[in-house]
Structure formats: C-alpha cells, structure tokens
C-alpha cells in the first residue's frame, strides 16, 4: 500500500517494495534462474561406447547434473536427461503418485521417470543421497528426507520401471574416499 501525504511524501506499508516511490523498473538482465536453465540445457549426450544412462531432471539431480553428467560421460556412457518440468510431464506421471502429502517437486519426478523409460535407455540413474556436497555454509548438509530417499518411492510405485534397469543405490558424495569405492 502506498500512502501519499498532503506534502507529497509517500510511505509504503505492507511490503518492502520501493518501486512506486523510486520509479525504478525491475532489472531482468541478471536472471539467475534463466541463466542456470540455459547452462543445464547445454548438457547434451555424447556418444558412449558403454551404453546410455538416463538422469531425471528433478529434485537434487537437477542441482547435481553437472557432476553426474561429467562422471558418466568420463566413464564412457551417453547421458540423457528427462525433459524440463512441465504440466504435461506432471500429468504423465500423476497416476503413480502414492500420496498427496508429497511436495510438488517430488510428484513431478514421476513424470521425469516415465519420460526416461520411454527413451529406451540402458539404465536410469537416480541414487539415494542422504547427504549433499558439504559447501561449508551451514551446520549440516543433509538432504530433505523426501529428496534423499524418493528414488525408493519411485522404484516401488512406477510400473514402467519393471524391466528397466533402475540404479537407485545409496551413495555418499559427501565423502570422496567412500564414493570411489561405492561407485
């Protein structure tokens, strides 16, 4: 709400937006989200001699795509990703969502898995990750329980995964020595 006084002064209440007072327009040239989507869209499959791996662009896999794409590509696999999230992708996987209480990003992952199964890949990779990479910015680096273990939910509720190699092992990327032995 902008309150204008008799002497011309303006006072804004209810939020911190000073646009009506300063007359400055919003600067959209530094849209971090658009920049990030552009970067992630640049990760294309490189022909791999060892087969093809699918990575769903959902939950923590969205954030970790640069790492996993480089990892599997260096090992000789062609890495394919599911399409960008959309209403259509959500609707495609909606029938396999076991609970309305899951967050919307988790519900979207069902559509991502369905899209990957339709690509006829050698395997789909979506590991359970209790911890994320420790960036040293907080007290801990736990993943949300839904994010950490949702691959288990997908494995048990997506019938299209039957007959599809689905790698959803528990992996610890937070401890490099253990990671090397696990992978």
Where are these regions (language model features)?
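An N-terminal assembly and electron-transfer interface module characteristic of large anaerobic redox
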Residues: 1-183
């Amino acid at each position: 709400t902008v309150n204008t006084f008799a002497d011309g002064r303006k006072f804004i209440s209810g939020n911190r937006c000073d646009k009506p007072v300063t007359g400055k327009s919003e600067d959209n040239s530094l849209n971090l989200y658009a920049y990030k989507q552009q970067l992630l869209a640049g990760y294309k499959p490189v022909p791999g001699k060892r087969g093809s791996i699918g990575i769903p662009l959902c939950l923590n896999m969205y954030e970790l795509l640069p790492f996993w794409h480089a990892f599997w590509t260096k090992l000789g696999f062609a890495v394919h990703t599911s399409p960008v999230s959309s209403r259509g992708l959500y609707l495609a996987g909606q029938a396999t969502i076991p609970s309305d209480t899951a967050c919307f990003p988790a519900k979207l992952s069902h559509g991502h898995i369905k899209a990957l199964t339709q690509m006829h890949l050698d395997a789909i990779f979506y590991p359970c990750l209790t911890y994320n990479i420790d960036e040293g910015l907080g007290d801990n680096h736990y993943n949300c329980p839904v994010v950490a273990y949702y691959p288990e939910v997908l494995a048990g509720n997506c019938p299209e995964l039957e007959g599809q190699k689905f790698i959803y092992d528990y992996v610890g990327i937070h401890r490099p020595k253990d990671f090397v032995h696990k992978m």
